[in-house]
């Protein structure tokens, strides 16, 4: 399996990557993360040799397309999200950009690559 895992430097995404690498070392994992306030790339240090890390935005359709095509991705697991409700009240823009526009961008790319599956992960913190 060739996975593109977005938001993998966040708490939940990083735990998914750590567990997946441990249980499926034969799989290819490409990580795409914007490294915003909720991310910590060091969460992925234990598996840094087993993954490809790309800093970038899920709303960048050209980047997502390139990663899917260059790495023969067959599954996108989307953990990317802005969370922390208090922050969204003071400025909703980054939340709309990532949680809505970013997710839409991934879906648009996948529509052009129908063999790619999407697993969308969310938490109560994005609402």
Question: What do these predicted regions represent?
Answer:
Residues 1-127:
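N-terminal Rossmann-like NAD(P)+-binding domain of SDR-like oxidoreductases, especially those catalyzing
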């Amino acid at each position: 399996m060739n996975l593109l895992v977005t938001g993998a430097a966040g708490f939940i995404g990083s735990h998914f990557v750590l567990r997946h690498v441990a249980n499926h070392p034969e799989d290819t994992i490409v990580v795409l993360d914007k490294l915003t306030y909720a991310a910590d790339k060091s969460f992925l240090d234990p598996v840094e040799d087993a993954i490809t890390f790309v800093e970038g935005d899920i709303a960048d359709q050209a980047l997502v397309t390139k990663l899917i095509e260059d790495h023969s991705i067959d599954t996108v697991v989307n953990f990317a999200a802005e969370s922390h409700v208090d922050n969204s009240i003071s400025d909703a823009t980054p939340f709309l950009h990532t949680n809505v526009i970013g997710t839409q961008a991934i879906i648009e790319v996948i529509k052009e690559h129908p063999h790619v599956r999407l697993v969308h992960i969310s938490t109560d913190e994005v609402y």
